């Protein structure tokens, strides 16, 4: 790592925006994280029920765990601790409750890592890629982006909420197509989730691997049941 201070320099901000943009080629538009089944089953049927579902995911479910993985990857990259970074990556890869979540995580992260190496190569990204390849560990998006944020000297307190907001916004976009919702209702849902994003970020910043866990069983169940859903637009 360089000895540059951690701040949100304009160049780092531009890169962070690019990585979290819907235009970044991770294929995130193909995944609904179980929301497609939840809509089909009637658990999500409008903006308010969508907000409730996603807030629970962010505070108690996979969104919370992804935030912790992001923070731990950021810390490990900041400290140049390759063994810790590999441990985080291995745990993140294993911490998938369904086969569709494995697919969703590994395919997006693989595409993200390949693009970062080609467009914004740096030592952190190369080291992470080498570690994962040597140990045949599939990448997880939160780990890739957390480590990359550290490599660009972006403070975790700014990078993490941006990551979680992107996580929620991608799922809102899927729900807009599935329920369906109007575009304005989609933006209202994203706005309503801002406090949940900030709360989840604040919690995760003080958490460690020991705090991983989920109390949002319906999210995992939705993903498992989506695997056998007859008519599907999304891959998860």
Segments the model singles out, each with a brief description of its role:
Residues 166-236:
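C-terminal auxiliary extensions adjacent to catalytic cores
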Residues 130, 134-182, 186:
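A contiguous pocket-lining binding segment that forms or flanks enzyme active sites
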Residues 67, 72, 76-149:
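Internal, conserved structured core segments that host functional sites
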Residues 14-24, 54-60, 94-101, 129-135, ...:
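A short glycine/serine-rich beta->alpha loop
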Residues 9, 23-26, 62, 101-105, ...:
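Secondary-structure capping and boundary motifs in well-ordered enzyme cores
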Residues 7, 11-80:
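Glycine/small-residue-rich interface belts in oligomeric ring/scaffold proteins
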